[in-house]
UniProtKB/Swiss-Prot annotation:
Keyword Acyltransferase: no
Residues with glycosylation annotation: Y212
Similarity field: Belongs to the glycosyltransferase 8 family. Glycogenin subfamily.
Gene expressing this chain: GLG1
Top EC class, one word: transferase
Protein name: Glycogenin
Length: 409
């Protein structure tokens, strides 16, 4: 078969996602190969992957790409040190023994069959993907349909050393976006960008968001969603099956619960336990002879935790606490939690001082002095009696007559 699904596993921590992806795809597609590129995994995990993947391709030490020398500042902005080795994803473009590959990240929930993407005609230097929720002019590299090419691979590799900060996020997504730009945004004066990106429906790679517009959009298109992508550091296998954290109003069943429901059905529940014991065997290296030895032991799996106990997930070398549920603050307005520093001037807290005298012009001073002297010289004037109050309101508006007609009677 010249078409295949492909993914990437760096370290043992994403093993649950790798097991989920292989078993879930096999439920709707038994014809195409399942390929996974691996690095820094234990021998036991390697043997387990061989049970479910058509090919397990080990990235040799001298071919691995480290992010740090290239895009450390950009990666630091994401605050995701766990993505330090994600640039190794570009090795998927070097699997030229396939005519067409569909890359899928391991942190996904598959709701519907999406093998129809293989019907798309794709050429070298073309890529089909879904817009990224963070900046839709870029695509999300969690799902990509493309034609493998040694030319594309070498071009991506060269850009890492030739163009400082070529990846806007320090990882594979920024680098691949630099080459495969949206056809509507392409400019003819940039020779560094050789590929073209064609946008797929958001239903093929839906990333969750707490944006107030997200829930109505998801509800309207729920039956069309093919794949849910759990972006961020917390993955579904790190949470309880009963964890609800997708939409605060409970309009949807938890996607995390759906992931666990599917996961528990694989291999008669063999992978159901929530906590996997640490696998501390030696890593697979280029000159390791242990990779050829027979390993009879399978990955040991502990009993599921009681959901009534305090929850803590441990796998590999990482430990995660269950995050607090997402609360709905959409009615609070923008920046309602902004802790803005309040500055208080010293004169605002002291007792108020005496008001300053109002400045008076020189002419006004002379006029006031003359009036005072005149009042001393004038005799006291007897004020007349005030007029009697009016009986009717209109009497106050009577005008003094200016003409008088004599009465000759």
């Amino acid at each position: 078969m010249t078409e295949a699904y492909i993914s990437l596993l760096i370290g043992d921590g994403y093993l649950p996602g790798a097991l989920y992806l292989a078993n879930r795809i096999r439920q709707f597609d038994n014809e195409r190969d399942l390929v996974i590129l691996v690095s820094d995994i234990s021998i036991k995990v390697h043997r387990l992957l061989e049970r479910f993947y058509s090919k397990v391709v080990v990235l040799l030490p001298d071919s691995k790409i480290a992010t740090s020398p290239y895009n450390a500042p950009e990666l630091h902005l994401l605050n995701r040190p766990d993505l330090e080795n994600v640039l190794n994803k570009i090795h998927i473009f070097h699997q030229t023994h396939y005519e067409k590959l569909l890359y899928v990240d391991l942190d996904v929930l598959i709701l519907n069959d999406f093998k129809g993407l293989f019907d798309i005609e794709v050429k070298e230097w073309e890529l089909y993907a879904v817009s990224d929720i963070g900046w839709p002019d870029y695509f999300n590299s969690g799902l990509m349909l493309f034609k493998p090419s040694a030319n594309v691979f070498r071009h991506l590799l060269a850009l890492l050393t030739e163009v400082p900060g070529v990846s806007y996020d320090g990882g594979d997504q920024g680098l691949i976006n630099y080459v495969f730009q949206n056809k509507w945004l392409r400019t003819g004066d940039d020779t560094k960008r050789c590929g073209v990106w064609y946008n797929l429906s958001f239903a093929f790679n839906m990333t969750l968001s707490n944006n107030y517009e997200s829930l109505p959009s998801v509800l309207r298109n729920l039956t069309d969603i093919k794949l849910v992508h759990f972006i961020g550091i917390v993955k579904p296998w790190m949470l309880k099956p009963s964890f609800v954290n997708d939409f605060p109003d409970g309009s949807l069943d938890s996607f995390v619960a759906q992931w666990w429901e599917q996961f528990s059905s694989f291999e008669n529940g063999e992978f159901l336990p929530l906590v996997f014991k640490n696998v501390e065997s030696e890593r697979i290296e280029e000159d390791s002879h242990e990779t050829e030895e027979k390993v009879d032991e399978e990955v040991s799996i502990s009993e599921p935790q009681d959901e009534t106990t305090d929850f803590k997930y441990q796998f590999g070398h990482h430990s995660f606490e269950e995050p607090a549920p997402v609360l709905d603050y959409s009615t609070e307005g923008e920046a309602w939690k902004l802790n803005e520093e309040q500055l208080t001037n010293q004169w605002d807290v002291d007792a108020p001082a005496e008001p300053l005298p109002v400045p008076v012009e020189e002419d006004e001073r002379e006029e006031t002095k003359a009036e005072a002297e005149l009042e001393e010289l004038l005799p006291d004037i007897v004020q007349p009696e005030p007029p009697a109050p009016h009986v009717f309101p209109w009497e106050a508006y009577n005008e003094k007559p200016t003409r008088v007609f004599h009465d000759y009677r």
